[in-house]
Structure formats: structure tokens, C-alpha cells
Regions:
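Extracellular glycan-recognition regions
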Residues: 1-300
């Protein structure tokens, strides 16, 4: 490793030691929210050698802020994980215990890259205003098709007046049962999202040009579930609550249905080939998928 790469590799976690759980920052604590949106979080207790997360009803969309266990990274990086997602019983895809109509589930887990909020003030969430979210994620679980495995990518930008909330653009695609490997590369303003399903080759899932993202980002793991109920809540109240029912409707119970397990989270510095330095990596006409995969996912 060259020195900078060795430094970033030290942030990685193979989830072999329960004590390393304390190395990961939690967004709800750092931004002074009163509610932990995880019902369960452990390394090794649920499954040896894996980090397990079971979320309460929650979401990342527009100004809904969900779970993020993260570290802070300056400059370019490649973040990689291997993840499995199930319903809470571990017997099938997320959302399959109770089912639901299309677009009601959105129970997924993956890698999230986020701009730190510059407006955070100690020591309660009264600082918060809508419209300030900037993030990208790549996740695996059940999205628009309840009870089926899918891949979701999302790019959220801050509001531009007269907009009153952050704006999210998402894409959903099919996937097979896990484990699935997810990889997010940040190279200058570009975010390259890669996926490898079990027994298959790496593929480029999505490319983004995000010059609005700062040089230092929050990078980590996220989980979210039960959009049908989470989406009934106002943004601030969602972000500050452990949700057990629909907004102002206690008779309509929440139905969170996700168990996510991560094998590792690894960080390296990307080594961009000289001919591609300065190229528009978000443009397939300028840089092909094969060229990206050659340096972001080399080998078998």
C-alpha cells in the first residue's frame, strides 16, 4: 500500500470483533436526534463474523433521515461491502412476512455516502430545517416489488429555491437472492456504483456527477424499511421518532420487515489509469463500463 491507501484501509472493518462496533459513528447521535432508528445492532451476536441491523420503520427520501453508521473520509475512496437481506424471520426477502402493494415496502440495506450537515448545532434537533440533504446510496433488498430482491440507487440533492425540500431521484432494478457485493467509488465529482450478484461478474449499476458534494463525506452502512408507514409522517417528526404506527393513526401499526447482515466494509483509494484522469466518468460515451470495471473491479 502507498501511505495514503494504508491510512484509509485502517478504517475498514471485517466485523470479526464485537468491540469494533464502537468505532462507527451513529448519525442520530451526531445530529442530536432523540430516537435510535435501529431496533437491533450487533457484531457477532446474531451471526458470527457479521454486522446485523434490524431497523424500525424509517426511510431515506427527500428530507426523511434514516439510519447511518459511518466514518468520515476526505478525498477519493472506494467503499465495498457484502450484504444479505431478509424478512425479520430470516425466511425470505424483506417484506415477505406480511406482503403489501407495489411501492409500499422499500426495505433495503447498503452503502450510503452523505455530505455532513453544516447547520448542526448542539444539543437537540431544533437546528434542523428541510432542504439540506445531499447523499447517494446503493442498496439491496425489496424496493418497489414487495417480497422480491431488488437493487435501489438514490441520488438526493439539496433544495434549490423555490423548492421547499430536498429532491431525490431513485432507480430500481431486479436482483437475485444474496449475498450481493456493493461498491461505491468516489472520484472527484463522480460517484460510480457497482454490483456483483452471487456467481456473476461485477457490473456498473449507475454513474452520477455530483459536484455539489464536499471533499469530506460521511461514508457507511444504512438500512430502512416500511415506506408505507414511514411516508405518512412529516419529515421532522419522522427523523425524531421511533415509529410504531402511521402518523396520527395509532390503530394503523407499523410493519418493519428487514434483517440486514454485512460481512465487511472495506475502504481503499482508487487508482485511476492515467488516460482516464480528468475524463467525464459519468458519461458512458467518454468512459465505457469496461474501462471503469478494469480499475474499480479487477480480477475475478
Amino acid at each position: 500500500d502507498w501511505p495514503e491507501d494504508a491510512q484509509i484501509r485502517r478504517l475498514s472493518d471485517e466485523f470479526g470483533q464485537p468491540a469494533t462496533l464502537g468505532n462507527w459513528r451513529r448519525i442520530w447521535r451526531d445530529e442530536y436526534w432523540p430516537a435510535d432508528q435501529l431496533e437491533q445492532l450487533d457484531i457477532g451476536a446474531t451471526r458470527p463474523g457479521w454486522l446485523s441491523m434490524v431497523p424500525h420503520t424509517s426511510s431515506w427520501y427527500q428530507d426523511y433521515r434514516g439510519e447511518l453508521s459511518y466514518t468520515v473520509i476526505a478525498g477519493d475512496f472506494v467503499a465495498s461491502t457484502r450484504v444479505e437481506t431478509y424478512n425479520r424471520a430470516g425466511s425470505g426477502p424483506p417484506g415477505s412476512l406480511a406482503g403489501g402493494p407495489p411501492d409500499s415496502e422499500y426495505s433495503l440495506a447498503g452503502v450510503l455516502v452523505r455530505a455532513p450537515r453544516a447547520d448542526v448545532v448542539c444539543c437537540d434537533p431544533s437546528w434542523w430545517q428541510p432542504g439540506g440533504e445531499r447523499y447517494v446510496f446503493l442498496s439491496f433488498g425489496s424496493a418497489s416489488q414487495t417480497g422480491a430482491w431488488q437493487i435501489e440507487t438514490k441520488s438526493t440533492r439539496a433544495a434549490i429555491p423555490p423548492e421547499t425540500h430536498s429532491v431525490s431521484a431513485l432507480e430500481v432494478g431486479p436482483a437475485s437472492a444474496g449475498p450481493v457485493e456493493l461498491r461505491v467509488a468516489r472520484i472527484g465529482p463522480y460517484l460510480i456504483l457497482l454490483v456483483r450478484e452471487s456467481g456473476q461478474a461485477w457490473r456498473v449499476q449507475r454513474r452520477m456527477n455530483r459536484p455539489d458534494l464536499p471533499g469530506t463525506l460521511q461514508v457507511g452502512l444504512t438500512v430502512y424499511t416500511d415506506w408505507a408507514i414511514a411516508g405518512t409522517w412529516p419529515y421532522a417528526e419522522h427523523n425524531a421518532s421511533v415509529i410504531t404506527s402511521a402518523w396520527q393513526s395509532p390503530g394503523t401499526s407499523a410493519d418493519p420487515d428487514l434483517l440486514a447482515q454485512f460481512d465487511y466494509l472495506r475502504f481503499v483509494r482508487p487508482q485511476v489509469p492515467p488516460p482516464l484522469v480528468g475524463a467525464n466518468l459519468a458519461d458512458p460515451g467518454a468512459v465505457s463500463d469496461a474501462q471503469l470495471l478494469a480499475f474499480l473491479a479487477p480480477g475475478p
